[in-house]
Amino acid sequence: MENLRIVPLGGLGEVGKNMMVVEYGRNILIIDVGMMFPESDMYGVDYIIPDYDYLRGKEDRIRGIVITHGHMDHIGALPHFLQEFTAPVYATRLTRGLIEVNLRREVQKRVKINTMAPGDVLRLGPFKVEPFHVCHSIPDTVGLGIETPVGLIVHSGDFKFDHTPVDGWPPDMAKLADFNRRGVLALLSDSTNSGSPGATPSERLLTSAMEDVFREANGRIIVATFASLISRIQQVMDVASNFGRKVAIAGTSMVKNVKMARELGYLDVPDNLIVSLHEIHRLPPQEVAIMATGSQGEPRSIMGRLATGRHSSLRVVPGDTVVLSSHTIPGNEETVHRVINQLFQKGANVVYHPLSPVHVSGHASQEELKTLINILRPQFFIPIHGELRHLKQHAALAHQVGIPERHTAAVEHGHIIRFTENSMEGGERIPGGYVYVDGSWVGDAISPSILRDRNELAATGVCYIAFRYNQNQGQLIDHPVIQTRGIASQEVLSDLVIEAEDIVRRALKGIAPTTTPDVVEKT
């Protein structure tokens, strides 16, 4: 019998760009195709996508792409992937809407996007995929039970055990019990909060925190969050309505997502609650709320531009209250802290987690993670979704509840894991890493050496020297033009510029004149 191979292409050993390959014989199932934010020293990089070179040459083996939910770290690389690969995509209704918002029309025409629902059974080659409902910070999130020829694999997706969710749909504990009855070969489980003791609070707690903010604020309220957090957008809209405030939406992605979610029925918002950014200037500040993108402080986002005063129609003024309703993604701390300081400098009152409970995590903490393992009792365990420290901590939790150490595999992306009906073993690590996206440039155009050059330019600046030189006479025609950027002010550099001119002249004196003139022949 063939081995089953699990090939993580992203999301293990890092936060973001989640992508998993499940392979049996000449059949491939893909789970999620996400992106991640760049680190602060990756100058000019918009975002990072998985390296899926492993799949090139295997396009005809891909039986389907199954998406667990609509956050960008799970769907953000799909537009790039589907430009190159044609395979059917399966997603829940809201997730499908979020995918289509980001796909070019020609890709949508070429690729079939199928709507699935918890309880469905997808037969994709030798794989029988059973999506089941889990709670997360976005509606329509699923985990996956995957029947394979060697056994049942359970992929948790991003999850937590929220028994009082804002959408009224608790996790499907009965399905988890059913998986236990059938026997689970391996559990692949979300590790994001594996270092957090206890259990993650319910999303409902966020409503009371927002009510406190709205009750105390006398001026405008600006709430920044991820554009895909549909449940959170609903909560803020409800609170704003209860406090007599109109809501304006700022940020292209949030405008598109709100429109789509309203059309699909995932946002229940009366038409008279939403106003345009232009209309808020005619309203008293105490009657205005603004929902915006940029909770991670991205320079080109709404919050990034508001913090630096570069937004065309909005300004942060004294008396405004700004709420950052999100967790700071690892690597973004410096950027977020800079934005918070800039907003304070402009006179705003800034409310942010963890100083105020205006954000609730969508990921399971330690007691929930142990509960999932105890319910499923898998033979083997692979922690997924997180930095290596998160994966190792999750593996330690699995040992606490009885999973033998030799039955766990805490590995980073690229490590192949092989399964038979009663064994798991690590294989080789395939080459791969980050694929950088900078505007329309993707991949090889932005190599690590390019990023090193950008870092060096940022650290040391650049100097340009231009001159006209008579090659026949061996003489400068006029003074060299020397310009600098990012080195020091012109006043400080004036003496150095004169010295640089002398260096140029001395260097050119060592070049012998050319006695034979260049000839351009007419043909």
Question: Which residue stretches match the model-derived regions?
Answer:
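His/Asp/Glu-rich metal-coordinating catalytic cores
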Residues: 1-66, 71-283, 301-315, 334-338
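Hard-cation-handling environments
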Residues: 195-325, 329-331, 335-354, 358-378, ...
